[in-house]
Curated annotation (Swiss-Prot):
Localisation: Secreted
Protein known as: U3-cyrtautoxin-As1a
Upper taxonomic lineage: Eukaryota, Metazoa, Ecdysozoa, Arthropoda, Chelicerata
GO molecular function terms attached to this record: toxin activity
Membership in a protein family: Belongs to the neurotoxin 14 (magi-1) family.
Keyword Cell membrane carried by entry: no
Disulfide bonds listed in the record: 4-19, 11-24, 18-29
A GO term from the CC aspect: extracellular region
Source superkingdom: Eukaryota
Tissue note: Expressed by the venom gland.
Keyword hit for Disulfide bond: yes
Its biological purpose: Is both paralytic and lethal, when injected into lepidopteran larvae. Is a slower acting toxin, being lethal at 24 hours, but not paralytic at 1 hour post-injection.
Amino acid sequence: WLGCARVKEACGPWEWPCCSGLKCDGSECHPQ
């Protein structure tokens, strides 16, 4: 398990992917 980015945490090419059920909206993860 490699971890994941939660709501309002950074996401993108050099960050963790968003947790399940979240989407990357620009630079932060948000609920879908």
